[in-house]
Amino acid sequence: MPVTQNRIPGTALDSKTILERIRFHLRYSIGVRKEDATPYALFKAFALAVRQELLDLHHATQERYRESQTKRVYYLSLEFLIGRSLENNLIALDLYDIFAEAAREWGIELSEIANTEPDAALGNGGLGRLAACFLDSMATLGVPGFGYGINYEYGLFRQQIRRGYQVEMPDHWRMEDSPWQVEMSRDALYIPVYGRVEDGVDRDGNYNPMWMEWRILVGVPYDMPVIGYGAKTVNYLRLYTASSTACAAGPRCRRSAHRRRAPAPTAARRR
C-alpha cells in the first residue's frame, strides 16, 4: 500500500534563502570563493543546496515509514540510467524557477550550471532506464521502494574522432565527487572471496577443513536521494563501491597486489 503523502509547496523557499545556501556550500563545503570556482564547483554548490532540501524530506519520509511499519520494495539491477539529477530534482521539488532566479541574481544562468553535470554512467541499455523509471514511479506514488546497484567508476566510453576514426577513451564520470551521493560507511559490507580449502583436523582429530588465502572485498554504499514528481516522498538508490581488500595470509607484496586489484568490480566499463 502506498504511504499517504503531501505535496510540496513551491513557495517554501525564496531566492534569497537559496542564494545564501549556495554561497555557504561554495565557501565551506567546497572551500572556494566564487571568483576562483570552476564550472563544476558552481554546479556542486547548487546541487548541495538542492540536496539539503532532499535530505530533509528523506528523513521525514523514513520517519513516516517507521511509524506506519509499512513493507518495503527493494529493486536490484546492474544498471540505473538516472541521467542528470539537478534539473530533474528541481522540477520534482517545484523549485526550478526559484533556483533560476537565484542564479540570475548571482549573474549566471541555471541552464549553464545544469549542463556542467555529467550523466551518471550507471548503465548503457534499456535495463537501466527501466530501473530508473521504476524508482521514480514508486517515489511519485509514495511507495517505499529502494534501488540497489553498483557504483561504476567508468561509463561506456568517451568518444573522440582522430583523423576520421573513432577513438574510445575511458569515461571518468566520477573523476569529481558526486554531490548527490552520500557515503554510508557505517553500512559497509565485508565479503570474503577467492582462496582455497585446505584439509585439516582439529585438536580432537575431527575433520576440519580451513578456508585459506582468502581476501576481503569491502563494499561501501553510497545513497542517492530519489524524489517523485511533486511529492514529499524521497526514497534512495544505494550504490556499492569496492573500496579495498586485504589478504588473510601471505607476504606483504601479495597483499599489495590484491589491494591494487580491489576496485575491479566497480571499475569495469559497461559494454
Predicted features along the sequence, with ranges:
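A conserved ligand/cofactor-binding region detector
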Residues: M1-R271
